């Protein structure tokens, strides 16, 4: 069944990076499988202001409208200092915000629970690439982005989350290893 996929790309190199290869392989395979793509390369967009308590502007409202039309949200970022890129984190803060993405049901005082909003029950995919190996990343660094984004943001919005992680993504990666990573991306698309 054809899906509408909203891709948010958060790497500064939109042409020749490993993350650009992930994006391009995903889009190519998705189109082969009949899916529709709505792509935002954040570094090619008008810069998003940082959250200051004001109401969302037209740019954020447009992102939300496009997101509401989608079946799948796919975010792509390298890991910088144990976080997604600042530009993607800012997009998350502004776009996947209350009361659009979730609201809060107060029970007593400040105690309560989140209520999923516009994207409830839809699928989210988070792609993260790391320069380090899987053992050091998963053993020593417990505040890694995929856990915080999944357990915090995406869970609040009621989304079903899938992760695809790439370790030891460094210049000089062998062609064989690169090809295996791209095959994982193609397999991911086939499971949508």
Q: What is the meaning of each model-derived region?
A:
Residues 2-35, 167:
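N-terminal beta1-alpha1 ligand-phosphate binding loop
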Residues 52-69, 181-184, 188-191:
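Glycine-rich, highly charged phosphate/nucleotide-binding loops
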Residues 136-192:
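Glycine-rich phosphate/pyrophosphate-binding loop and the adjoining helix
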Residues 56-148:
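Helix-loop-strand module that forms the ligand-binding subsite of alpha/beta enzymes
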Residues 11-13, 45, 130-135, 168-172:
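A short, flexible beta-alpha/helix-coil linker loop
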Residues 8-10, 40, 127-129:
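Short hydrophobic segments within beta-strands
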Residues 39-58:
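N-terminal beta-loop-helix "entrance" segment that forms/cooperates
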Residues 33-38, 159-161:
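A generic structural motif
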């Amino acid at each position: 069944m054809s899906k509408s996929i909203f891709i948010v790309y958060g790497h500064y190199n939109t042409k020749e990076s490993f993350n650009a290869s992930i994006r391009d392989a995903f889009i190519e395979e998705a189109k082969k499988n009949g899916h529709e793509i709505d792509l935002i390369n954040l570094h090619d967009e008008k810069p998003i202001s940082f959250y200051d308590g004001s109401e969302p502007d037209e740019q954020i409202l447009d992102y939300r409208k496009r997101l509401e039309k989608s079946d799948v949200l796919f975010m792509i970022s390298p890991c910088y200092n144990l976080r997604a890129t600042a530009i993607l984190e800012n997009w998350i803060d502004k776009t996947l915000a209350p009361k659009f993405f979730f609201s809060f049901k107060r029970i007593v005082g400040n105690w309560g629970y989140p209520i999923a909003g516009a994207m409830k029950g839809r699928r989210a995919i988070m792609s993260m690439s790391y320069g380090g190996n899987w053992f050091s990343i998963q053993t020593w660094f417990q505040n890694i982005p995929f856990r915080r984004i999944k357990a915090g943001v995406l869970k609040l919005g009621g989304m079903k989350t899938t992760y695809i992680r790439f370790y030891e993504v460094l210049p000089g990666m062998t062609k064989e290893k690169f090809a295996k990573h791209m095959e994982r991306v193609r397999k991911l698309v086939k499971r949508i």
